[in-house]
Regions:
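Short beta-strand-plus-loop segments that form exposed binding edges in beta-rich domains
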Residues: 663-669, 721-727
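Feature activates predominantly on carbohydrate-active enzymes
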Residues: 102-323, 339, 364, 368, ...
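Contiguous, structured surface segment used for ligand recognition
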Residues: 28-166, 510-520, 528-530
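Extracellular carbohydrate recognition and processing domains
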Residues: 622-654, 686-706
Length: 742
């Protein structure tokens, strides 16, 4: 699949080997062993193992599923039907359980010699992860689901001891706000398993959709799973048979599927189906745009609590996981404050604030789940709202130091901070990134990898790490229509673009001790994994070329030395500020330019798969006092009469508070007129500032001021202002937004 490669492979190998400081045990023939996540111990020995059609797979009787999995993966790519030998002591590849030799859960020992392969695990999970390591030793074509011809199926001789540092290595997939079909979920599980992640948080319920069949309440999926008009409705759900199939698929791959049944908030899809679940009983529609509904599950009605018991009973019977996720985030408590039934419960339980009702409800559910041998998991709000006595597990997404509170209150924690592990944020601000969440700064691959996980509370309370992929951007946008005639599911491609390669960074953060992590080493190994992702048909985000050096010359120019972030890929570049294409000049030696902002370079994997360019954003440090750069106008955009100018400010509006918007005239000879400014949350008008002001070179700044008191994370914000050129259209300028009060 990697047909578009340069002739510079050896040159790049030398550059990367010099640039990366590799551990001693990886130094021998390091190009052959590039494992992710990095094992605890690797010792390379002499020789290679060669797989052949006569190779056999022997296994302990308890490992039949893992043996059949290995047989299937090797069979698809080699075309060979390798023979399985149950309870065999002699086989080419031998899978055995021996807790005495491997002392840690999910640990394994892998011995590859020219004569054969021995894989020993403490448990089935360890065997499965040993298989994943073994597959990474074979050529990347091993991941193809079609027979690959002309491949030498060779693995280097090596001894590997390995085990995870943390028991919880998770990923959340949001199928509620956008429905992914069963086959895509299987592919997602495959990709998680490939990199030794073992927990899939299945976000099945949200305001925008109910995705789990509950037989006692059929309208949840008949009504709550669909949005939009009948002729163009969107949505879907998983039958209970679908769920059983996914669970079985995950079990072989050591992926535990944990259902998330959201309450008390994010439950509008259920309220649409059964209005009596809410405090008001009002009829709603399943939203086609993301927002946080004020409607909550009514805590004061026995009928609502019985609904919750019934749904959780069916869910627990369906999912064998020892955990059940109850969500619990972002509740707005005004409905409970206004509800007579909820107020009665508050009085009965001696609660002072409506928010404490959430703690009361969490206690009720946690006790119910404890009786069913389940542990409740939820977002950190579940132990921050009220006094929760029964131990729960909190997903720390907002403030990592809340792990301290979890410990103090007798709970455990999983780190999934939005600042590092929310994969619906873009990796960069480079123009050309696809539509993404913007209420926080981008999360680069390096930032994801740099997350610290043991600085906030005793290690025993932090079970591990989890990444999250939210799908609310799908229901904002129009760029994700499926292209049927090309057989292209753009929504699935979009999900993979945001998840990969950051999932590989998450894998290593979750698996390895913090002291064993090194980003340069990881980046080197990662460069050899993209071709493996290609053979898995994964639509990953291609990383930009790596700037190894950027040195000034004696003449004041700048010399760029680059290396490809993807092994064997091309680098194409331009020096005039234009975006490179696959036909731009090929980078082979350092490039010198007079102005770095005119230098662009892209990584080209193949003619249809390439990166965004290296991009140097303009320097706005001189305008720091005005806040964050938001937009600009140029002569081409200037109209001769007052016309609404609309631009997005999502991310710059970051919470409730008072903001200023400054329009700064930077160039031109004629004045620029500004009129009334309006702030929108999606299509809802939040603020309007009537004003008429003229700015020019002598009086270059116009400032507007407004207050936001109904902020919603994940919701797009826009500014619309009347603007025009006065006696001409030669002006240019910048717009900045500053939050001045909380």
């Amino acid at each position: 699949m990697k047909s578009y490669r340069t002739m510079c492979k050896k040159t790049w190998a030398v550059i990367l080997a010099i640039a990366c400081h590799l551990p001693a045990t990886w130094a021998t023939n390091a190009n052959e062993i590039e494992l992710i996540p990095k094992p605890v111990h690797v010792e390379q020995t002499s020789g290679n193992f060669r797989l052949s059609p006569k190779s056999t797979i022997g296994y302990d009787v308890a490992l039949q599923g893992q043996a059949e999995y290995l047989q299937q993966v090797l069979g698809q790519s080699t075309g060979w039907d390798l023979k399985l030998k149950k309870d065999a002591r002699k086989a080419t590849i031998l899978l055995t359980l021996n807790p005495e030799k491997v002392d840690k859960p999910e640990g394994y020992r892998l011995d590859v010699t020219p004569k054969g392969i021995s894989l020993t695990g403490r448990d089935a999970g360890g065997i499965f992860y040993g298989i994943q390591t073994l597959l990474q030793l074979f050529p990347p074509q091993v991941y193809s689901d079609k027979r690959q011809h002309g491949v030498e199926w060779i693995a280097p001789a090596v001894t590997i001891y390995d085990a995870p540092n943390r028991p919880w290595r998770g990923m959340m997939l949001d199928v509620a706000r956008y429905f992914y079909d069963k086959e895509f979920v299987k592919k997602y599980i495959d990709m998680m398993a490939m990199y030794k992640l073992n927990k899939l948080q299945f976000h099945l319920i949200d305001d925008s959709g109910w995705r789990l069949e509950i037989k006692k309440y059929p309208r949840l999926t008949e009504v709550g799973a669909w949005a939009g008009p009948d002729h163009n409705r969107l949505g879907g759900f998983y039958t209970q048979e679908d769920i059983k199939e996914l669970i079985a698929y995950g079990q072989v791959r050591n992926v535990e599927i944990i259902p998330e049944i959201e309450f008390p908030a994010h439950i509008l899809s259920a309220v649409v189906a059964y209005p009596w679940l809410s405090c008001t009983g009002l009829q709603h529609e399943v939203p086609t745009q993301h927002f946080i509904s004020r409607d909550l599950l009514c805590v004061g009605k026995e009928s609502s609590l019985q609904f919750l018991r019934d749904v959780l009973d069916e869910t627990v019977r369906l999912f064998p996981s020892s955990y059940i996720n109850i969500g619990g985030d972002e509740a707005v408590y005004t409905r409970w404050e206004e509800c007579p039934d909820c107020q009665k419960v508050m009085k009965r339980e001696g609660l002072k604030k409506a928010s404490e009702l959430q703690g009361y409800l969490t206690n009720v559910v946690a006790e119910m789940m404890k009786e069913k041998n389940r542990t409740v998991v939820g977002w950190e709000e579940i132990f921050l709202r009220g006094d929760v006595k029964t131990p729960v597990v909190g997903l720390i997404w907002h403030n990592v130091r809340d792990t301290l509170l979890a410990t103090q209150r007798g709970h455990k924690a999983i780190l999934t901070p939005a600042t590092h592990m929310y994969f619906d944020f873009p990796e960069s601000r480079t123009p050309g990134e696809v539509k993404a969440a913007t209420w926080m700064p981008p999360i680069s691959l390096e930032k994801c990898y740099s997350m610290e996980i043991n600085d906030y509370s005793p290690e025993s309370t932090v079970l591990g790490v989890q990444g999250c992929f939210w799908s609310d951007q799908f229901i904002h946008g129009t760029v994700l229509q499926e292209i049927d005639y090309l057989n292209e599911n753009r929504s699935e491609n979009y999900a993979e673009y945001f998840t990969f390669p950051r999932l590989l960074a998450l894998s290593e953060v979750a698996w390895c001790r913090q002291s064993d992590r090194n980003y340069s080493d990881f980046r080197h190994r990662l460069s050899h994994h993209f071709n493996r992702l290609d053979f898995k048909n994964c639509h990953y985000r291609v990383p930009e070329p790596v700037i190894e050096q950027m040195n000034p010359t004696a003449t004041g120019a700048i010399e760029f030395t680059l290396s490809p972030a993807v092994a064997d890929a091309d680098i194409r570049y331009t020096t005039d500020g234009s975006y490179p294409t696959v036909h731009s000049p090929l980078y082979t030696t350092p490039v010198t330019v007079n102005d770095k902002s005119n230098f662009r370079a892209i990584t080209v994997v193949n003619p249809r798969h390439y990166s965004l360019p290296i991009y140097f954003a303009p320097d706005y440090s001189g305008y720091k006092q005005y806040g964050e750069y938001t937009a600009e106008w140029k002569p081409l955009n200037v109209q001769p009469y007052l016309t609404p100018w609309r631009f997005e400010c999502t991310g710059k509006i970051s919470g409730n508070g008072t903001y200023t918007v400054s329009f700064i005239y930077t160039k031109g000879e004629t004045p620029f007129r500004l009129g009334t400014l309006k702030l929108y949350k999606r299509d809802e008008l939040l603020a309007e500032v009537p004003q008429s002001v003229l700015i020019n070179a002598n009086s270059p700044i116009a400032t507007y001021r407004f207050t936001v008191d109904s902020f919603e994370a994940g919701t797009p914000f826009f500014i619309e202002v009347e603007a025009c050129g006065e006696k001409g259209n030669d002006t240019s300028g910048l717009v900045f937004i500053n939050k001045v009060t909380q």
